[in-house]
């Protein structure tokens, strides 16, 4: 059914389209678009193409936005990096626009894309409430950037990306104006195969003509099996003792230990395989002939953020989150620290019964010892930044240690970066716990299966509802009579499942209630469970300092390792998984404790690596000699945020957790000043971001708030607040959480090791509960 679009009825269109695109007619020009209206910001995105048979390289598009959206961008190819990005904004009653692409997720800078030809069509306009850009985009279906050829899937289903900002661009009259990073972004599904009309009709619209609704042109696409409403035989669902939702660090440990105990376990992962050993196939060209994927090779970590086909990121979470086997541990830098005593102390928010983490960390260490020299030849490579940084730190009284041999020594301590890699490849919980779990006949693993909500009768969980109707009637998978569900979907995924299950604050559950698809699956309002899900959220505020030193090899800033690595290094890695590519970019880590005005002790962690995400300086510099020190504030911070969902049910931060308490900011500024205070003790070391035209304080005060994100989110389902000491969700009889969301405060280092140790302890407590299964 076609939807009639008018500026005054945008909320109606948004409600109708939800998160999947559909056809509508623009009444100003009669063009039939396939599009989507974001219900949060009220922005509509539309596309229409000539016939598939024409093989045309153009389309007509439109953006309709309320004036509150100072600029809007859309990427029909479905990614922000190395993809066509069309950006527009109103200025003096007219539309200013450009075709661009971005090269780094760490910078809001974009560059003009040569090739696309944009023509504004007559129905573009600005009025008192909205602005509308209707355009013809020629040479816009395929393009080539440094990551290779890209294209819009014009005869298939696609996932366009959008971005918007409430902050105006720097120079509104300039189509190539710079601007700050978007204040929000997202994705939606669109069947491009249905977005075509006849060539004659398209030609009329492209010339600025108007007409009524046309007949869509024939396409060669086949119907999607997921949209069929035909009658099918009733599926008989298999009940399980435990259903583990999510194949990240916590979920894989839980599934392994539960199945090891002889329980009948179902492990569900919404994404697909990662490592080659798990069925993953996404390879760089130079890896062809091996079984190594992008996720196996540690040296490809930096390319996770610059790939034109980043299918591993969750499309319904507006921060980086891994929707792939292994979750965040499949795509992060692999830094791996055994927890300190304080990480599980009562002062850090843990129940007293959790204080002795030692036996559980020992179990973790037996399975995953980690290494600060993961290359199979035992050597370390590209260590110039280690040498430079160690001189800087030695001058400030730091001690060089083997970090995981001294986990409680975290003040004025530094050492080689330690990773959860093994045999020169990424390991984490994927090649350890997962491999032993799936080898057991009592564990069933299903990938590409998304859990929407738990099915419950009051406090009793009966099973889970998924998107896979082959697993049970309407996708519902039941528990055995004494069974339990373990949510391990991460700090954004787990809260959303709870909201969709009627568990959490009423404002979040009400958003679910108003959703046409999710609302009917809620329990009766009398059975809603009011818990502070989403509150008490922490993440490390982090700031990058960029230096140059003549001894440093920036390794082409990691820009060539995917498409054109140094030949000798590629050959060495393929031969025996040794060399530069057998470890990720970090080379050194350090910690320092700070007392502060509120009498609390806060810890600063530093990570040193060759290369830099972005450089801001008025002076010339040698890009082949750049290195970065990232300073994070961790244990002891008091700032907290909130995680929730919006009207589209996209998971997102509702309140950012960085610098809510000004004391946190003051301590981080002090730490940065201390780091740079020793520069004169290292001949040749130059700070270029910030350079000498900016003070550290001004640099921090003007730092892009979105760039403070370290993506180390913990706490939205904190133990003692949302779950009890046995990880049981309060108000339920058999729903548990084992993931980062129960961690009540930030550990002193990157959280993966602490999360894994917590998972070992949590699953032991679950198995010890009376009442089974």
Regions found by a protein language model. Name each.
Residues 1-25, 486, 739, 773:
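Fungal secretory targeting signals
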Residues 349-404, 578-754, 762-773:
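FAD-dependent oxidoreductase catalytic-site/capping-region signature
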Residues 257-260, 264, 271-277, 281, ...:
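Glycine-rich loop(s) and the adjacent beta-strand/alpha-helix scaffold that form part
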């Amino acid at each position: 059914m076609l939807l009639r679009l008018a500026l005054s009825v945008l909320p109606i269109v948004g409600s109708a389209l939800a998160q999947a695109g559909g056809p509508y007619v623009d009444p100003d020009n009669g063009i039939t678009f396939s599009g989507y209206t974001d219900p949060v910001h009220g922005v509509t995105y539309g596309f229409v193409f000539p016939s598939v048979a024409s093989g045309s390289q153009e389309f007509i598009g439109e953006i309709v936005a309320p004036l509150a959206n100072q600029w809007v961008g859309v990427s029909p190819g479905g990614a922000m990096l190395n993809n066509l990005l069309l950006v527009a904004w109103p200025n003096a009653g007219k539309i200013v626009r450009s075709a661009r692409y971005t090269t780094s997720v760490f910078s809001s800078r974009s560059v003009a894309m040569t090739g696309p030809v944009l023509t504004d069509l007559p129905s573009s306009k600005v009025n008192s409430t909205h602005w509308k850009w209707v355009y013809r985009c020629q040479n816009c279906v395929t393009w080539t950037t440094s990551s290779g050829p890209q294209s819009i899937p014009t005869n298939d289903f696609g996932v366009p990306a959008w971005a918007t900002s409430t902050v105006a661009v720097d120079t509104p009259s300039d189509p190539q104006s710079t601007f700050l990073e978007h204040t929000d972004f997202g994705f939606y599904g669109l069947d491009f195969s249905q977005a075509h009309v006849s060539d004659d009709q398209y030609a009329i619209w492209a010339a600025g003509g108007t007409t009524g609704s046309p007949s869509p042109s024939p396409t060669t696409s086949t119907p999607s099996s997921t949209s069929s409403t035909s009658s099918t035989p009733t599926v008989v669902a298999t009940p399980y003792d435990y259903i583990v939702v999510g194949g990240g660090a916590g979920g894989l440990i839980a599934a392994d230990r539960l199945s090891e105990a002889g329980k009948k376990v179902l492990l569900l992962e919404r994404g697909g395989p990662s490592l080659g050993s798990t069925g993953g196939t996404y390879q760089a060209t130079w890896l062809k002939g091996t079984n190594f994927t992008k996720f196996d090779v540690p040296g490809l970590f930096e390319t996770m953020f610059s790939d034109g086909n980043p299918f591993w990121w969750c499309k319904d979470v507006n921060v980086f989150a891994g929707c792939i086997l292994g979750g965040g541990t499949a795509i992060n830098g692999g830094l791996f620290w055994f927890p300190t005593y304080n990480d599980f102390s009562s002062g850090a928010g843990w129940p007293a019964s959790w204080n002795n983490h030692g036996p559980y960390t020992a179990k973790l260490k037996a399975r995953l010892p980690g290494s600060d020299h993961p290359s199979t030849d035992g050597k370390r490579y590209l260590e110039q930044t280690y040498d430079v940084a160690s001189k800087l730190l030695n001058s400030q009284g730091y001690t060089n240690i083997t970090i995981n041999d001294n986990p409680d020594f975290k003040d004025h301590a530094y050492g080689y970066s330690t990773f959860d890699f093994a045999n020169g490849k990424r390991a984490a919980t994927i090649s350890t716990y997962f491999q032993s779990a799936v080898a057991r006949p009592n564990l069933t693993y299903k990938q590409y299966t998304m859990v929407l909500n738990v099915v419950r009768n009051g406090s009793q969980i009966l099973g889970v509802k998924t998107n896979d109707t082959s697993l049970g009637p309407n996708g519902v998978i039941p528990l055995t009579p004494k069974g339990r569900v373990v949510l391990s979907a991460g700090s954004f995924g787990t809260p959303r499942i709870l909201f969709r299950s009627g568990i959490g604050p009423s404002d979040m559950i009400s958003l679910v209630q108003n959703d046409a698809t999710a609302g009917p699956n809620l329990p009766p309002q009398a059975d809603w469970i009011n818990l502070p899900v989403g509150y008490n959220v922490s993440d490390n505020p982090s700031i990058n300092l960029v230096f140059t030193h003549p001894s440093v090899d920036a390794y082409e800033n990691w820009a060539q390792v995917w498409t054109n690595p140094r030949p000798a290094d590629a050959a060495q890695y393929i031969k025996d998984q040794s060399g530069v590519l057998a470890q990720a970019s970090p080379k050194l880590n350090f910690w320092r404790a700070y007392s502060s005005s509120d009498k609390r002790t806060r810890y600063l962690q530093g990570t040193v690596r060759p290369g830099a995400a972005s450089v801001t300086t008025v002076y010339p510099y040698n890009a082949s000699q750049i290195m970065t020190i990232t300073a994070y504030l961790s244990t002891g911070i008091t700032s907290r945020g909130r995680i929730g969902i919006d009207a589209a049910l996209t998971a997102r931060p509702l309140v950012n957790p960085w610098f809510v308490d000004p004391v946190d900011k003051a301590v981080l500024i002090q730490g940065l000043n201390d780091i740079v205070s020793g520069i004169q003790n290292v001949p040749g070391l130059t700070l270029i971001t910030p350079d000498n035209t900016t003070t550290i304080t001004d640099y921090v005060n003007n730092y892009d708030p979105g760039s403070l994100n370290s993506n180390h989110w913990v706490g939205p389902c904190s133990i003692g607040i949302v779950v009890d000491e046995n990880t049981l969700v309060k108000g339920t009889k058999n729903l548990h959480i084992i993931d980062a969301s129960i961690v009540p405060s930030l550990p002193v280092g990157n959280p993966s090791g602490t999360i894994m140790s917590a998972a070992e302890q949590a699953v032991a407590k679950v198995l010890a509960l009376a009442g089974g299964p």
